Each structure stands twice: as C-alpha cells, then as structure tokens.
C-alpha cells in the first residue's frame, strides 16, 4: 500500500488570519472573510524583455470579487460588525460596490451603494446587484457621491462608511505589500500602481514601511503612481472638476487619500505621472496578449506608467519592478469587445480552419 501523499500546500486562511498580528483586529471579533489575499506574483517575461527590467505582476483581480478592494473590505466589514453597525455604505465607480456588497452579504448586514450616473462598468454593477446591495444612482460624479456618503454616515452613525477614507480599509490593503516582500525576500526597486482615490498607494507604502521598520525588508521601493490624463489631480496639483477617462475605476477628480498619497510619493522618492487613454489601452492589450493576464483598463495604468518611466529614464534598466494590476478584465467586458473583428463562419472542414489560422 502506497504512503499517503502530503498536501501540496496549506490552505490560505484569508489575510486577516495570515497577518493578524499586524492588523488592528480584536481577539473576540468574528472575521468576515471570503479568503481574500494570497494573490499570485507573476513574473512578466515579455514585459521584462521589453523594459530591460525584472517585472512582476501582482494580480489582484484574483481576489474573490475580482479586485484589490476585497483586502480592505474584509477588515472594514469585520470592524463594522464588531461595533454592531446595521449597514455599510460606499460611494463607488464599481469595484468598491461589488466588494462591499459581497462582504455585507457574508456578514448578514445591509449594503447601500451610491453610484455616479452613467459612470460605472456593467460587470461591477451586476455584482453589487446580485449580492443584494441597495443601489442609489446620484446625479453627479464619484466625488459628489463620496461627499454625500460622508454626510450621511456622519448623521447616521449606525451606518459604516467603507470607502478608503475608512482606516480599516487601508489596514487590509497594506497586506499586499507584505505578500510581495514575503515572495521576493525584500521590496522591489519600484512599485507601480494605478491611482484613483489614492487609498491603495497609501496602503502599499504603509505596508512596505512597516516591514522595513521591523527588519523584514532591508529596503523600501520608489512608488510610481499613474493616473489617467483626464483624471490626474495628483499630477497637476489641483482637483479635476469633470474627470473623464475610459479607465472608470480611476475616474476620480479629488482623491480622498490625497495627502497620504503625496506623503508616500515624497517619502519614497517616487513620482506621479499621467497616461493617456491610448497609452492605457495599449498596455491593456499588451499584458493580455503577451502575459496572458486579462485586466480591466484602470489596472493597465500601472504598466503604462512603467513603460513611460523606462522610456524617460526614471526607471533604470535592470531594476526589479512590481506592477499591481488591480482588477479583473471581466469587470469591463465592453472595452475588450470594442473593435472586435467581424467573425465570419467557415465550413465544417479542417482545411478551412487551418486556412483561417494562416497555417499550412
């Protein structure tokens, strides 16, 4: 009789249990989790060859609801439940609503979502609807929605605001930096990521800084935050009244985490830059076709920023770079299908298929 085979690896417990000693979680709190975190860090071979750097992709679209938001939401909803709050509320361009709705459903509490009129990808809205969220469309943009959410939760303290202004969101999201250092053995030279409401760059810098402070990592990365050119307040230094970009997840004109994002950029000797929609879409197609990673357009801003920064010399060849790709491409299928070539039927004949493929 053959010996029993050992498990290939231990099951991932979710990020709260994995990093409990580094999170502000009470011992008696009931954890609200969908086993988020533990996402892969994939070596991007062809983008590495293109840039002359060693590039890794932190693929956050493989979190339970398809985006990095789940990292913060597990901690924020766990804390809200511990405080006995009756509902959670968020303003959202899409991913936050999907995540908040899922974790509220898991916790057995109400979720309400304020969305800007006509400014949300349908895949994300479908998730929130399926998880039972109460969807409220606001005649305004994301910034208007967030201001309304702030006022509402201030007036009704039984409702928790779970946007990234909630510090527990930042605590959960910082764990992605822990995972990167755990995988690489130290921090990368450069960490590139998209910037919208700016909570994520704040969280990554917090995570890297804590690991460095405690001697887990012997260095800190330079933070490279890329905004869409039509929604680039951190680049221009002024709020954008009517932000516009195909990258809906970062279509934000006045980031809630503005000050902490600037601190992360300055303390890390990093930079903010703007990428046009054309540059973002080029990176979106590049990562899908050369690395097999399908991301939503906003996610590709990190790669667009890297390409621009290699071109202008800010990122030196030979650097180790991590690009966070924040959301799954299935969040926004409409963008992927735009410009799709006309499909013409072929006969039920192997030679016809071979000819269509251009093979011999």
UniProtKB/Swiss-Prot annotation:
InterPro entries in alphabetical order: Ser/Thr_Dehydratase, Ser/Thr_deHydtase_PyrdxlP-BS, Thr_synthase-like, Thr_Synthase_bac/arc, TrpB-like_PALP, TrpB-like_PALP_sf
Instruction: Look up the record and name the cofactor or cofactors this protein needs.
Output: pyridoxal 5'-phosphate
- Annotated pathway: Amino-acid biosynthesis; L-threonine biosynthesis; L-threonine from L-aspartate: step 5/5
Q: Which terms does the record give in the GO molecular function aspect?
A: L-serine ammonia-lyase activity; pyridoxal phosphate binding; threonine deaminase activity; threonine synthase activity
Could you tell me what reaction this enzyme catalyses?
O-phospho-L-homoserine + H2O = L-threonine + phosphate
Instruction: Name the enzyme's class.
Output: lyase
- Pfam families for this protein: PALP
Which residues does pyridoxal 5'-phosphate bind?
95, 196-200, 326
Q: Which residues carry this modification: N6-(pyridoxal phosphate)lysine?
A: 69
Question: What keywords does the record list, in alphabetical order?
Answer: Amino-acid biosynthesis, Isopeptide bond, Lyase, Pyridoxal phosphate, Threonine biosynthesis, Ubl conjugation
- Name used for this protein in its record: Threonine synthase
Originating species: Mycolicibacterium smegmatis (strain ATCC 700084 / mc(2)155) (Mycobacterium smegmatis)
- Lineage start: Bacteria, Bacillati, Actinomycetota, Actinomycetes, Mycobacteriales
The gene designation is: thrC
